[in-house]
């Protein structure tokens, strides 16, 4: 299986939506832009947000198996994907790419 690199590319926060719709929460996202993890054998890397993993898992597993070219040419690099976590108030965009043959 291939190793898959997961990189946080962009993190945004919609303060207007948070003020209007969200109840205050004690802990928010710790992910920083540029932070990266390596998935081995299609498994969730230590330290990656479990909720973010839920949105990217199928893509990471497919890339680890050597698959790619999602949605018939969606990405310039067919062995990659751009996935966002499901937090509508402070989403993080992750670039996922197969990096090595094991």
Region roles according to the model:
Residues 13, 41-47:
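Short, charged beta-turn/beta-strand-edge "cap" motif at the junction between a beta-strand
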Residues 2, 13-22:
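Short, structured beta-strand/loop micro-motifs enriched in basic residues and often containing a Trp
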Residues 19-43:
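Short, flexible N-terminal segments of the mature chain
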Residues 1-5, 30-33, 101:
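A short, structured loop/turn motif at beta-sheet edges
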Residues 58-102:
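Short, compact, well-ordered microdomains
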